[in-house]
């Protein structure tokens, strides 16, 4: 199953300039997702981080993982039409710089759901090498 940007926008509320995933190549609703972010030299954050040596901010890599995780959890039947709120990040590690031209592969596995709260383990890759990883805590709520 391959989701494009419009499909993603039908699941999560994020929009430009804060929608940080471009494509979903695999989804097991409520369990696992594989998504991608194509990092280009036109990204707004490169204007200030850093103009002479553009590097994607680590917090935005984590946010991209959180958005991918939100697609996984909000695709589960009982959570369709809801919104996922980022609760916490634990054990975050940044292993390599993400620069223009890179394609981030974002893998998130939902490891625990209890009621409307849960935890996902996210890993971002460039090729086969880890760029970042962490545990993402989230809450599911109503849009209104």
Swiss-Prot record:
Example of a GO cellular component annotation carried by this entry: cytoplasm
Signal sequence interval, chain numbering: none
Locations listed in the record: Cytoplasm
GO biological process terms on file: fatty acid biosynthetic process; lipid A biosynthetic process
Coiled-coil ranges per UniProt: none
Main enzyme class: lyase
Disulphide bridges, residue numbers: none
Active site: 49
GO molecular function: (3R)-hydroxyacyl-[acyl-carrier-protein] dehydratase activity
Record keywords: Cytoplasm, Lipid A biosynthesis, Lipid biosynthesis, Lipid metabolism, Lyase
Keyword Magnesium in record: no
EC nos: 4.2.1.59
UniProt catalytic activity: a (3R)-hydroxyacyl-[ACP] = a (2E)-enoyl-[ACP] + H2O
Keyword check for Protease: no
UniProt function note: Involved in unsaturated fatty acids biosynthesis. Catalyzes the dehydration of short chain beta-hydroxyacyl-ACPs and long chain saturated and unsaturated beta-hydroxyacyl-ACPs.
PANTHER family named among the record's database cross-references: 3-HYDROXYACYL-[ACYL-CARRIER-PROTEIN] DEHYDRATASE
Family: Belongs to the thioester dehydratase family. FabZ subfamily.
Protein name: 3-hydroxyacyl-[acyl-carrier-protein] dehydratase FabZ
């Amino acid at each position: 199953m391959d989701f494009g940007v419009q499909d993603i926008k039908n699941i999560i509320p994020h929009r430009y300039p804060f929608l940080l995933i471009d494509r979903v190549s695999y989804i097991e609703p409520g369990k696992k997702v594989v998504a991608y972010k194509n990092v280009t030299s036109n990204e707004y954050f490169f204007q200030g981080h850093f103009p002479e040596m553009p590097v994607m901010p680590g917090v935005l890599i984590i946010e991209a993982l959180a958005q991918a995780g939100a697609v996984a959890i909000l695709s589960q039947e009982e959570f369709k039409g809801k919104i996922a709120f980022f609760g916490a990040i634990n054990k975050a590690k940044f292993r390599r710089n993400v620069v223009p031209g890179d394609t981030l592969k974002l893998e998130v596995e939902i490891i625990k759901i209890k009621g409307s709260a849960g935890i996902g383990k996210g890993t971002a890759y460039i090729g086969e090498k880890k760029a970042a990883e962490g545990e993402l805590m989230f809450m599911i709520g109503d849009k209104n």
